[in-house]
């Protein structure tokens, strides 16, 4: 309806104003497609990312790799469950990848092709730096994200089939699990 269209237009104008302020305050220049991608992100998740997030820090610095940017945008793919926990939402994963394609390549097709995700599963023995990262297809998993523990030695990320992840090239979506020294010597 026309009324609903007016509501959406006002919401978008509000996000444009906030993004314009963020860009001006931080002397950031963007291309039209980069601006469009950040408006799409803001419309979906709000403007909180403009405060103290990895994405805002990268944009402020002006120096970032494709994968750093991908993971900084990709981390915004969670929804809150009724119990209060935040979980990865597959639809938002696809949306973030499509926004990346707009930001990086001016590709407005809505496709999420060209990127893969790695999900880092939480373990009881330690903490992980993040629960998901995005990587451009064919690239190396860089930046990489480790797991840490005050009492355990981290041995690496293992696949669902129990094999150490040694091929660090983004060729498919993967779920990996932290393995600890005590897992082998208990």
State each model region's role:
Residues 10-53:
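Active-site nucleophile-His-acid catalytic modules used for acyl/amide transfer and hydrolysis
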Residues 30-34, 65, 169-172:
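Extracellular/periplasmic catalytic domains that process cell-envelope and extracellular macromolecules
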């Amino acid at each position: 309806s026309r009324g609903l269209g007016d509501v959406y237009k006002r919401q978008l104008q509000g996000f444009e104003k906030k993004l314009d302020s963020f860009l001006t305050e931080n002397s950031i220049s963007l291309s039209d497609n980069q601006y469009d991608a950040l408006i799409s992100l803001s419309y979906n998740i709000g403007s909180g990312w403009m405060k103290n997030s990895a994405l805002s820090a990268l944009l402020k610095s002006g120096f970032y790799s494709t994968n750093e940017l991908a993971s900084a945008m990709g981390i915004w793919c969670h929804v809150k469950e009724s119990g209060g926990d935040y979980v990865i939402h597959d639809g938002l994963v696809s949306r973030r990848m499509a926004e990346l394609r707009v930001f990086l390549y001016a590709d407005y097709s809505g496709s999420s092709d060209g990127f893969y995700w790695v999900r880092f599963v939480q373990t009881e023995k330690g903490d992980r730096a993040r629960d998901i990262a995005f990587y451009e297809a064919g690239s190396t998993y860089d930046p990489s994200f480790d797991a840490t523990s005050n009492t355990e030695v981290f041995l690496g990320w293992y696949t669902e089939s129990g094999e150490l992840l040694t091929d660090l090239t983004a060729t498919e979506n993967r779920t990996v699990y932290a393995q600890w020294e005590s897992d082998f010597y208990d």
